[in-house]
Curated annotation (Swiss-Prot):
EC number: 3.4.21.-
SMART domains assigned to the protein according to its UniProt record, in alphabetical order: Autotransporter
GO biological process: protein processing
Phenotype of the disrupted gene, per the record: Altered processing of autotransporter proteins IgA protease and App. No longer processes extracellular LbpB. Increased biofilm formation.
Modification after translation: A fusion protein of the first 44 residues with beta-lactamase is lipidated in E.coli, strongly suggesting this is a lipoprotein in situ. The lipidated form is briefly retained on the cell surface which allows it to process its endogenous substrates on the cell surface before the passenger domain is released into the medium.
Other comment: Probably a phase variable gene because of slipped-strand mispairing of a polycytidine tract in the coding sequence.
Catalytic residues, chain numbering: D139, H211, S427
MF-aspect GO terms: serine-type endopeptidase activity
Species assigned in the record: Neisseria meningitidis serogroup B / serotype 15 (strain H44/76)
Matches recorded under PROSITE patterns: AUTOTRANSPORTER (PS51208), PROKAR_LIPOPROTEIN (PS51257), SUBTILASE (PS51892), SUBTILASE_SER (PS00138)
Chain's role: Major human immunogenic protein. Autotransporter with a secreted protease domain involved in processing other autotransporter proteins including App and IgA. Probably autoprocesses to release the about 70 kDa passenger domain. Processes the lactoferrin receptor lipoprotein subunit (LbpB) extracellularly, releasing it from the cell surface. LbpB release protects bacteria against complement-mediated killing by anti-LbpB antibodies. Processes NHBA. Plays a role in extracellular-DNA (eDNA) mediated biofilm formation. In some strains (including cc32 strain H44/76 but not cc11 strain B16B6) eDNA stimulates biofilm formation. When NalP is not expressed (and no longer processes NHBA or IgA) biofilm formation increases. This is probably because the number of positively charged, DNA-binding peptides on the cell surface rises, resulting in increased biofilm formation.
The name this protein goes by in its record: Neisserial autotransporter lipoprotein NalP
Listed Pfam families: Autotransporter, PATR, Peptidase_S8
Length: 1083
């Protein structure tokens, strides 16, 4: 037996002539018929428009002529195994306006128009290209030379020998970046592997483009050199089974059968079959086939025109169909067939297997062709001159309607050094579906053939009349919608075996209807985002199923399964021997209800995970058993006071067993929530289980947490806990603070609740801390101490001291005359204390003058502008300042000197930090810093030309800071004004050594000590409080700091001079490095 590819020509010749014929036939006729993306045969119709999705609306049942209800029995092709529904007649029509343009995507190139028709763009934009998916193509055509097409690099091609049994692989690798092209001459009998050596832009190839090349390009052709017309799945691996019998236009059945075997052996899951046996039954109405199997077999043979001998029956039904059935059942393969181009009411015979064998339906999809208005193509091709025109166009889905959909009949491909080739025929409708199936398998690699065909069929766009009918099948392929999973379960239960680990999640985002159910297997997670109305049961045997919306189905959770309700959701009855999880992953804070519209049974082996504020509402009876895990994490439970209250977590019309039947109860109170006991209450509306909860003492909790904190944070953690406890004592005393309503009503600033109105945001922020993870206690309490204010102020004061010292050093080396100098100074360092590190950075630019004001007196003054930054933990500070520095030195002959120093600066400290559990606060504070210093030095001769000076003295720092209030959080800090004075002792050595009459080197070493310490902590309270007070934390600035430096002065001549300095100040915990360069002019 021989078959032909489904080109729209009577006798296919895969040559340039055949292509030319295909491109010249542009007339299309036809009408009526339609498909649907849902399995309801009495659903209302939808139009076809821009980015529209099929929807169903109930309407009166439609009578379908020619179909008897009893024929539905055991006829999966008609009724999907159901005996209570009918199928539209193949000629059924519905009065409706003409369908609009089907373009739903927006690929701009006209050669990609067929991709817009199937809404491909969402799939491409999501990054799906078919990578990692193996696709088989059983086809024919002159294609040995075409393996040098760069668009098809990576394609694996297999020919066959004369016995149609042994295939030789021709494997093309990626095109190398260098090397020229070469023609490849090989026979299909060669036992060799061919590797091309060609660049995508330098290809010499055969003149003829075969049918096999065109089909391959539609599925997996790559876009080369910027050309837009690539295939549907350009990264898929293509296995080409060339079954050419030597005539270039026909295929041997034995070769086809063996091709399927070889693809199955290679693990190929998706197979494109753009061929078929030409129908000779004309418009024979196979809907009238009687129920008996023998009559069907005879009608099938009559329809196919096959050989009626025993050998013909063996080849047609035992060999071909038996081969298909085996691979569908045992190899999990999906076979996609074209309907053919005879403009007949029935498709080619290869796709009829499910009519004969019901279970085969899960592995076969038949594809009809549609034009851009959604109707079938009818093409006219004229034969020899003087003959009547012969009509050719897409065959209808016919009796394969339940496993049939439609795809564009026309497409465009482009090979290197060719213009775009316009092609037409169901040969190219089928690979459009095949390519989409490859994208789908890339996204859901666990999908079975049944999963794939269910998803592709049920997401099709509804075109034409309503219902799965004999023209369009399920409707027009919608690739974008298919990538969101199935839209219906019409073929029985949908088994999702999501193989993998629990950290991998897959999502179905369509609303799912149908009479089937869902069986969840495998370790990975499956998420349902739609509002689902399917009526079959949902059984979770393994992994987790997450519901983001409503689910009408009754649920059963097995021991290795988990059901997660994310957010407010509802569903049917629930029976669980596994895990039922109600805690939110996003901790949104809403008082959400999971509504079970039926009964609840928690068996002894299962576990209920829930949290305070989440209510499990059961309309029927609740039978309680197993383990309860109650968490106080999240915000839903609201603020808890020290007295406590009941928080319900389960309500039912009746709780059939006492709550004590929870065999084990575990609780997670979070940071400050204490869960005391479970209580059962009965009311007019049913029974309720509640937990009695109260808050813990923040100061004691923080003190305990400080034991495990780094030494540098202990004080801040304890201070933050004390601040929070003071605040919660105030909240406890406010009106109605213990009720859940407090959070919502106070947030709305209701005038009828004046006692709590000022605390709306404060209750929410405090509640978030109460219910936070206990492991985050150190971080949270530290943030409530706001240490960044004191620490950044201390860092700024130290840097201003470094800048004043620079003025002091300049007095020692000014020389004679008036000197003007400009300098830039860069500071940086770290402050590590008890395992906690802070970082500082600073930059200052100064201009100033220095001059001899008398025979033994030198004076200097500079103006500086600077910016410094400080970062610690999750807080950052930026300090901008402007300061005046001045100094005077008086020499007492060669013995020594006296110095007076002064600085005054204003600063603005801008703070950004996290506070509490998950809030953010920002603030700014203004202040001034004045410094006064008095120093004396004694000169000691050193070597022949050098000088050594011993210097000592005192400096007084006076810091004044304004009051401030942070914004953005009720747990931000509202600080009082601050005044702090610090006396600093100074001592050091200075060494100067001239190198010449124009260059001098300097070295310094010394010590600074705060004689009375410095305390920049800020008293105040949280911005969300009205009475509670506290103070910020602070690092302990080292009282004693070592200082050292190196430098040089150079005279350039003509009055110009320059300087360079490096200095260090620090201790074991603290270090500040400073570099300074300047240039001056001496008058």
């Amino acid at each position: 037996m021989r078959t032909t590819p489904t080109f729209p020509t009577k006798t296919f010749k895969p040559t340039a002539m055949a292509l030319a014929v295909a491109t010249t036939l542009s007339a299309c006729l036809g009408g009526g018929g339609g498909g649907t993306s849902a399995p309801d045969f009495n659903a209302g119709g939808t139009g076809i428009g821009s980015n529209s999705r099929a929807t169903t609306a109930k309407s009166a049942a439609v009578s379908y002529a020619g179909i008897k209800n009893e024929m539905c029995k055991d006829r999966s092709m008609l009724c999907a195994g159901r005996d209570d529904v009918a199928v539209t007649d193949r000629d059924a029509k519905i009065n409706r306006p003409p369908p609009p343009n089907l373009h739903t995507g927006d690929f701009p190139n006209p050669n990609d128009a067929y991709k817009n028709l199937i809404n491909l763009k969402p799939a491409i934009e999501a990054g799906y290209t078919g990578r990692g998916v193996e696709v088989g193509i059983v086809d024919t055509g002159e294609s040995v030379g075409s393996i040098s097409f760069p668009e098809l690099y990576g394609r694996k091609e297999h020919g066959y020998n004369e016995n149609y049994k042994n295939y030789t692989a021709y494997m093309r690798k990626e095109a190398p970046e260098d090397g020229g092209g070469k023609d490849i001459e090989a026979s299909f009998d060669d036992e060799a592997v061919i590797e091309t050596e060609a660049k995508p832009t330098d290809i010499r190839h055969v003149k003829e483009i075969g049918h096999i090349d065109l089909v391959s390009h539609i599925i997996g052709g790559r876009s080369v050199d910027g050309r837009p017309a690539g295939g549907i799945a350009p990264d898929a691996t293509l296995h080409i089974m060339n079954t050419n019998d030597g005539t270039k236009n026909e295929m041997m059945v034995a070769a086809i059968r063996n091709a399927w075997v070889k693809l199955g052996e290679r693990g190929v899951r998706i197979v494109n079959n753009s061929f078929g046996t030409t129908s000779r039954a004309g418009t024979a109405d196979l809907f009238q086939i009687a129920n008996s199997e023998e009559q069907y077999r005879q009608a099938l043979l009559d329809y196919s025109g096959g050989d009626k001998t025993d050998e013909g029956i063996r080849l047609m039904q035992q060999s071909d169909y038996g081969n298909l059935s085996y691979h569908i059942r045992n190899k999990n393969m999906l076979f996609i067939f074209s309907t053919g181009n005879d403009a007949q009411a029935q498709p080619n015979t290869y796709a009829l297997l499910p009519f004969y064998e019901k279970d085969a339906q899960k592995g076969i999809i038949t594809v009809a062709g549609v034009d851009r208005s959604g109707e079938k193509f009818k093409r006219e091709m004229y034969g020899e001159p003087g003959t009547e025109p012969l009509e050719y166009g897409s065959n209808h889905c016919g009796i394969t309607a339940m496993w049939c959909l439609s795809a564009p009949y026309e497409a465009s491909v482009r090979f290197t050094r060719t213009n775009p080739i316009q092609i037409a025929g169901t040969s190219f409708s089928a690979p459009i579906v095949t390519g989409t199936a490859a994208l789908l398998l890339q996204k859901y690699p666990w999908m079975s053939n049944d999963n794939l065909r269910t998803t592709l069929l049920t997401t099709a766009q509804d075109i034409g009349a309503v219902g799965v009918d004999s023209k369009f099948g399920w409707g027009l392929l919608d690739a974008g919608k298919a990538m969101n999973g199935p839209a219906s379960f019409p073929f029985g239960d949908f088994t999702a075996d999501t193989k993998g680990t629990s950290d991998i999640a897959y999502s179905f985002r369509n609303d799912i209807s149908g009479t089937g159910g869902l069986i969840k297997k495998g370790g990975s997670q499956l998420q349902l985002h739609g509002n689902n109305t399917y009526t079959g049961k949902t059984i979770i045997e393994g992994g987790s199923l997450v519901l983001y919306g409503n689910n009408k189905s009754d649920m059963r959770v097995e021991t290795k399964g988990a059901l997660i309700y994310n957010g407010a959701a509802s569903g049917g009855s629930l029976n669980s021997d596994g895990i039922v999880y109600l805690a939110d992953t996003d901790q949104s804070g809403a008082n959400e209800t999971v509504h079970i519209k039926g009964s609840l049974q928690l068996d002894g082996k299962g576990t209920l995970y829930t949290r305070l504020g989440k209510l499990l509402k059961v309309d029927g009876t609740a039978i309680i058993g197993g383990k309860l895990y109650m968490s106080a994490r999240g915000k839903g439970a609201g603020y808890l006071n020290s007295t406590g209250r009941r928080v319900p977590f389960l309500s039912a019309a009746k709780i059939g067993q006492d709550y004590s039947f929870f065999t084990n109860i575990e609780t997670d109170g979070g940071l400050l929530a204490s869960l005391d006991s479970v209580e059962k209450t009965a009311g007019s509306e049913g029974d309720t289980l509640s937990y009695y909860v109260r808050r813990g003492n923040a100061a004691r909790t923080a003190s305990a947490a400080a034991h495990s904190a780094p030494a540098g944070l202990k004080h801040a953690v304890e201070q933050g806990g004390s601040n929070l406890e003071n605040l919660m004592v105030e909240l406890d005393a406010s009106e109605s603070s213990a009720t859940p309503e407090t959070v919502e009503t106070a947030a709305a600033d209701r005038t009828d609740m004046p006692g709590i109105r000022p605390y709306g945001a404060t209750f929410r922020a405090a509640a978030a801390v109460q219910h936070a993870n206990a492991a985050d206690g150190v971080r949270i309490f530290n943030s409530l101490a706001a240490t960044v204010y004191a620490d950044s102020t201390a860092a700024h004061a130290d840097m201003q001291g470094r800048r004043l010292k620079a003025v002091s050093d300049g007095l020692d080396h000014n020389g004679t005359g008036l000197r003007v100098i400009a300098q830039t100074q860069q500071d940086g360092g770290t402050w590590e204390q008890g395992g906690v590190e802070g970082k500082m950075r600073g930059s200052t630019q100064t201009v100033g003058i220095a001059a001899k004001t008398g025979e033994n007196t030198t004076a200097a003054a500079t103006l500086g502008m600077g910016r410094s930054t400080w970062s610690e933990n999750s807080a950052n500070a930026k300090t901008d300042s402007i300061s005046l520095f001045a100094g005077i030195r008086h020499d007492a002959g060669d013995i020594g000197y006296l110095k007076g120093l002064f600085s005054y600066g204003r600063y603005k400290n801008s703070i950004s930090r996290s506070t509490g559990a998950d809030e953010h606060a920002e603030g700014s504070v203004n202040g001034t810093l004045m410094q006064l210093g008095a120093l004396g030095g004694v000169n000691v001769p050193f070597a022949a030309t050098g000088d050594l000076t011993v210097e000592g003295g005192l400096r007084y720092d006076l810091l004044k800071q304004d009051a401030f209030a942070e914004k953005g959080s009720a747990l931000g800090w509202s600080g009082n004004s601050l005044t702090e004075g610090t006396l600093v002792g100074l001592a050091g050595l200075k060494l100067s050594q001239p190198l010449s009459d124009k260059a001098v080197l300097f070295a310094t070493a010394g010590v600074e000590r705060d004689l009375n310490g410095r305390d920049y902590t800020v008293t105040g309270g949280f911005t969300g409080a009205t009475a509670a007070t506290g103070k910020t934390g602070a690092r302990n600035m080292p009282h004693t700091r070592l200082v050292a430096g190196l430098g040089a002065d150079v005279e350039f001549g003509n009055g110009w001079n320059g300087l360079a300095r490096y200095s260090y100040a620090g201790s074991k915990q603290y270090g500040n490095h400073s570099g300074r360069v300047g240039v001056g002019y001496r008058f």
